[in-house]
Amino acid sequence: MYKFYFILISLLWFQHDSVQRGYSVELTQNDISNALEIHNKARIEVGLNIIEWSDDLSNEAQKWANNLAQKNKIYHSSNESRLNQGENLYYSFSSQNGKPIFSKSPAKEASLAWYNEIIDYKYSVYGSKLNESVMIGHYTQMVWKSTTKVGIALARSSDGKEYIVARYSPPGNFMGEYPY
């Protein structure tokens, strides 16, 4: 009888504990290729060199994505925790009949959203009054002239929210500087 209660309590504790946690989701090679293609298309359009995939940056991005999914909250990491890395964030959630529907290409979806900020972007130095009322920082990080590497990662919260984090090296978005 005592063993049964111990097992039941242990199972309930484990279940409660796992509900509080997010989890890593490995991106497919196809999704990585598509996301990188979108980044490089944006860069080529403005006359920049392409950037390369970095497993190291992807691993760093995964740590932060896991943190966001565990807390079920989106916010940027501190500059101190990601020295010499830029960061783009994306959040997604959709459901049908109360069940989450996951994106088939989350890194591609995020990259397209960041790229589409070009619609509002007016070429100027970062932080210019020309762009102060629009969100363009994800796009400018994608096309920052000195950036050479990117890594992207995905984590899901227990309720199905998807958190996508991209890390860039060297970082961009320096006040008073042109992105390209």
Specify the residue positions occupied by each region the protein language model found.
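Sec-dependent N-terminal signal peptides
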Residues: F4-L12
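Disulfide-stabilized extracellular recognition modules
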Residues: F93-Y180
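Intrinsically disordered, low-complexity regions enriched in Ser/Pro/Gly/Gln/His and often acidic
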Residues: F6-I7, V46, L57, P106-K108, ...
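Short, well-ordered surface patches within globular domains
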Residues: Y23, L27-G86
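Short gly/Ser/Thr-rich phosphate-binding loop of adenylate-forming enzymes
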Residues: L89
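Bacterial Sec-dependent signal peptides at the C-terminal "C-region" and cleavage site
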Residues: L11-E26
